[in-house]
Amino acid sequence: FEASGGGVTVSGGEALMQMDSVGELFSRLKQRNVHTLIQTAGLFNYKVFENLVLPYTDTIYFDLKLMDSDAHKQYCGVPNHSIHENFRKVQALARDSVIEVLPRVPLVPFITDTDENLSAIADFMLENGVKNMQILPYNPIWLDKLPRFGSVQRLDFGEGTGKFMPDAELDRCTEIFESRGIHVHCHR
């Protein structure tokens, strides 16, 4: 760890549901000059975040899934208004070089990877001054983990459910952002 110059990433579930603990951990890490990164889906109390976690955070990986609030509620369980507002706030800090923010879009076939959704996300990125982002290709390995979490129900959202995303689909998704001048990083 020390030889590599690495840092500490806290992710979840939603790590920011434990802001007291994350803030304390990051505070101690910063005392040792360790780089800190939080991965979030964006559903958190910004005032608490601003006081407890932000002062000790170097980088935020901020996942955005769906722009339509009804679809977000259907698939994620909550509307996305506060998520978008939190993104605007942290991205404003990134524009002022207070913190590094990397927006990320997890691609789920026929849900988050539609042209309509990705175009809306791209427009939202432009409105917020984003020039670089990451897309996270769908990975079907999670399906085999469901029984370990007590779930016997296998979700099915079409023929893409059990397959890795083909390169042509990743190219299509990438082009939606890059055609608007947003650089996309994607691990294939």
Residue ranges and their predicted role:
Residues 27, 92, 127, 168, ...:
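Polar/charged alpha-helical tracts
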Residues 179-188:
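Radical SAM enzyme core and accessory elements
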Residues 1-141, 147:
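Conserved AdoMet/S-adenosylmethionine-binding subsite of the radical SAM
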